Amino acid sequence: MSPRVVVTGTDTGIGKTVFSAALVGALDGVYWKPVQAGLDEETDRDTVLRLSGLPAERMLPEAYRLNTPASPHLAAEIDGVTIDPAKLALPQHDRPLVVEGAGGLLTPLTRSVSYIDVIASWHAPVVLCARTTLGTINHSLLSIEALRARDIELLGIAFIGEAHAESENIIAAMGQVRRLGRLPHLASLTTDSLKAAFADAFNIGDFFKDATA
């Protein structure tokens, strides 16, 4: 089976999509966003296509495309749709698969199912993306605890934003988690600038470590 990794985050709007674009590009893989909520502007799949440098056929179609930019459970209800977790099984592919979640781990997909419930069913390793700004310590440690409470493999934490060594170090130490690196905010966000920033900050060997053993 080809390597698979799930990219999740401590919150919405922290940079998971940009990180996913960098990761899938570095792995020369395929990208999948199971549930897209909000279609009026550039979707996350569109963003990854634009930034990853990969061809369009590497962007797998979403299982659900919902019109309203809201929590998936609410966006689905507005559209008159019920998200069926059984339809969110990981796709099989001969290339590395990068899966991007929506919002944070406990973001509801239905009135009774959260994203973390589906992630647990995938049995795939997770990368947790976190901000470096005020509040990230609590959010990060809570997310780490939630993953471990469900026996979800955590590859490590990827920080996004300006350097804040103390926050990054205390999260890694108290959470007993690998610090994978930090992706800075880029003044000019292009395929080339993102590729260079990711290569400078991360060791691709830290991802899919089991697959290369």
UniProtKB/Swiss-Prot annotation:
SUPFAM superfamilies per the UniProt record, alphabetical: P-loop containing nucleoside triphosphate hydrolases
Binding site for Mg(2+): T17, E100
Subcellular location: Cytoplasm
GO molecular function: ATP binding; dethiobiotin synthase activity; magnesium ion binding
Cofactor or coenzyme needed: Mg(2+)
Keyword Disulfide bond found: no
Database matches in Pfam families: AAA_26 (PF13500)
GO CC annotation, single: cytosol
Gene Ontology biological-process annotations: biotin biosynthetic process
Catalytic activity: (7R,8S)-7,8-diammoniononanoate + CO2 + ATP = (4R,5S)-dethiobiotin + ADP + phosphate + 3 H(+)
Keywords tagged on the record: ATP-binding, Biotin biosynthesis, Cytoplasm, Ligase, Magnesium, Metal-binding, Nucleotide-binding
Entry annotation: catalytic residues: K33
Disulphide-bridged cysteine pairs: none
InterPro entries: DTB_synth_BioD (IPR004472), P-loop_NTPase (IPR027417)
Domain of life of the organism encoding this protein: Bacteria
Keyword hit for Magnesium: yes
Pathway terms, separated by semicolons: Cofactor biosynthesis; biotin biosynthesis; biotin from 7,8-diaminononanoate: step 1/2
Subunit structure: Homodimer.
Cited NCBIfam families: bioD (TIGR00347)
Function: Catalyzes a mechanistically unusual reaction, the ATP-dependent insertion of CO2 between the N7 and N8 nitrogen atoms of 7,8-diaminopelargonic acid (DAPA, also called 7,8-diammoniononanoate) to form a ureido ring.
Family affiliation: Belongs to the dethiobiotin synthetase family.
Protein name (record): ATP-dependent dethiobiotin synthetase BioD
Gene: bioD
